[in-house]
Every structure is written in C-alpha cells, then in structure tokens.
C-alpha cells in the first residue's frame, strides 16, 4: 500500500487521545466510502506511525478500533478489519523502514480483538478474520520466508508462538466457529511463516491436526484438511516421517458423504505421492482399493483427482518432476478456492 512520498515523522510521546479519536472518526468515515477507502487506510498508517513509539497511544488506537468494529454489521466490518493488520505495516522503502520488533507488544491486544470478533460475528466474516491474520503474519515475520538458514531472534520466535497459540487454542475450542477460524488461520500461518519455523514446529502442528481429525465431533474438518495440505506443501520432502500415518488418517475420508471432503482427501494423497513417493508408492495397491469406487463418483472434481492419482500409480512416478510440482500447486490453488460447504 502506498503511503505517499513524504518521510514518516515519529513523534514522541505521540498525539493526545483526543487528537487520535478525532483522526480515527474521520478515518472510519473515509473507509466506509469506496471512493475514499484507500485514503482512509493511508491516513491510518500515518496515524499509527506517528504514535508507534508511544505504547499508551497505540493501545488507545487498538482499543478504539476494536470498539468501533465490534457492533458493525458483517459488510461494514470487512473493510474496517483491515485496520488491525495495518497496525503492523512497515514501509518497504529503506528510508522509511521500521524494525518489525517495535510492533510485537501490540500483537497480543490485536489477537484479543480477533478472538472477540469470532464470538461476536457470523460465519461470513471468518475468511476476513483469517485474511487479516495472514497480513499480520506477513507484516511482522521476516520477508525471506523461503530461507532455511536464517537465525530468528527470540522476539520473532515469541511472536510466532503467540500466533500459533491463537490458532491452536481456537482449533481445540468446543465451538464450530472457533474451530473454523482456528483452522483457517493456522493454514495462513503455515503458508506465510519462514521455512525455519515450519521445520521447528511441524511435528507439533501435525500432531494437533491428527488428533483433531480423529475426533468424530470435530465439525471443521474441511478447513482441517486444507490446513494439512498446506503443511505438506510447505514441508515438501521433510514431511516424509509423517507420510504413513497421515495417509491412513485420510483414507477414511474417501467414503465421506461430503464430496468436498472426499476431494480434499484425494488432494492430500496426491500431495503425499509427489513429495513422499518412496513412502507412499509401496502402498499403492492398498490405496487403489479405496479409489475404485471414486472412479465413477457422481462429482466431476472427485473423479478427476482420483483418475490423476491412478495415472500416477500406473506410471509409478511423475515423468517430469519440476513440471508436476508447478502443476500440483496450481491444481491445489484452484481446488481450494472451490465453493466451501456451509
């Protein structure tokens, strides 16, 4: 997001609460009008950066935004919730760059706001909550997420653990809304966190997913399967030690009455074959025994993935690994964007 060409000025100790309140009211008005929405976001960024080094003022901003968003209707909440992620936005230019660690003290109150929004909102706002969460992860985690040799500072690890804790707490909570949002957010965390953190916490995340998949009354398994796919795609061949147990957990979903779950289970198997083929291919006859019925599944998307897996088995392995890898990620991107079951 553009913040203009002016250099950001940091004022210490910051603006008065009355000045902040007046600015926020003007910003809310602009955000709720499409023609001035981006202007409102830019003004909010400048407001945050003016008060960034004044914790009491920053907490006042967070509390005011939280109290403003909570009573809004879902359609009104959507554009305003982006303010919660903009709190952590650092300009990309070297001239205006801000050390991401300065944002860490504000992570806890913002996550508390998201937690309250789960309780006070209906399901239409859940994707927005997860998208805001993803933007927060992107804004405060190291930008080079593919680097496996970077050393994270303790503050960065603590911030990650706080966000991971938010996800797992909601996934284990005895309410469908929390479970859905927790699973959606964990998917975003896995997709946007540095590789070094994926390696460190993969076993913990995998165990959480496996334990919840086992629970018959866990009513967010569509989101959970999506999360599992993202975990495998992020880990790639490092997922090998977990391949066998994962396979046996998802095979039961191939007989599920929900076609979306059947399709996602097939996607998990397809991803496992690609990244952990030495573990999975010896079990192909066992897997095929589950796939036979799906060759004539009434849902086209299910049949297509089933036939693709059978084709891979018949060839024993992908002919062109690099091309298959690109196609694999493209297929899952389109599949996961399919209409979700309500």
Explain the meaning of each model-derived region.
Residues 32-33, 72-73, 121-122, 174-175, ...:
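Short inter-helical turns and helix N-cap capping residues of alpha-solenoid HEAT/ARM repeat scaffolds
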